[in-house]
């Protein structure tokens, strides 16, 4: 079972005076931390926030994901979460949040935090079966559908990967403000594990997912089956790797990240292992001489619960911090990670307290949105109150 513990990270105060944790090799630089605070406060009114929805048939494997209690409900998790992020707990929502074994969708946290600071998100989708009931950018034809299960070793056609990458690059190059990138991809931690493993990063004991008891053995078997028939070599072509064992979010996000950095825009990656897989793939795609400049204004924002999760091989530091260290070592770069200060230990709502015992943990950019709220003067006390109010509203529907 996973557990939360004190980890080797630095405590850092944001503008709300509430504290967050910072980690990664760049966390020891006060100038970088102050630069982060300035970037993500002075421009809060005009940041570009993009939530990418994507689908993979990997999510239909029994027991692989808790982002919906059944494989049928996981098919509409992404559109339900996106609709909640946009509109909150209103009765007019078309897509009900999928039933969970415990907890509540992290979209509730993301909605509360983003609403308090006035950040509106653009929704983009690739590989979603449903037709969204809200404005949504279709990155590709909806007829493409979800990517195949990664056990096939043929998740996507290489042309699809190329097209998604180019669409992301095009959007990134057009950015004129800092980018907050978030995602909702049921089954996405498994595709992230596959991609990181394919890049030579030993991550199978460091990636959990939304379950309280992560199906890590199952994930490992799925990844091994997907990779075993491939002849990718020690340094695989990133796009070929994504075509084999990735999902539609990944090539689009890699292109978007590369494009954003080409035009010198700071990027906050909201999430956990899925964002690290995107970052690692981007690093594998560029010349080594460019890597330090590339990562300079990239940060990874997540929740307390994910950043402090302890798994079997993460002795002395959390699994996520150990994973960041592996990516740093693999590409010889220094990364900056931050985890929000929001805790539900004393919440009056059981579905929120469930986060404290290992359920859900992260998703829909929850940690990043909370960090931005904290950095712009919103207290954790206020966030808890508003999250509890949103739960009450949800219960009335």
Curated annotation (Swiss-Prot):
Disulfide bonds: none
InterPro entries the UniProt entry points to: Nict_dMeBzImd_PRibTrfase, Nict_dMeBzImd_PRibTrfase_arc, Nict_dMeBzImd_PRibTrfase_sf
Xref: CDD domains: DMB-PRT_CobT
GO terms assigned for molecular function: nicotinate-nucleotide-dimethylbenzimidazole phosphoribosyltransferase activity
UniProt-listed Pfam families: DBI_PRT
UniProt xrefs under PANTHER family: PTHR38811, UPF0284 PROTEIN SLL1500
NCBIfam families in the cross-refs: nicotinate mononucleotide-dependent phosphoribosyltransferase CobT (TIGR00303), PRK04447.1-2 (NF003369)
Family: Belongs to the UPF0284 family.
Name of this protein: UPF0284 protein Pro_0435
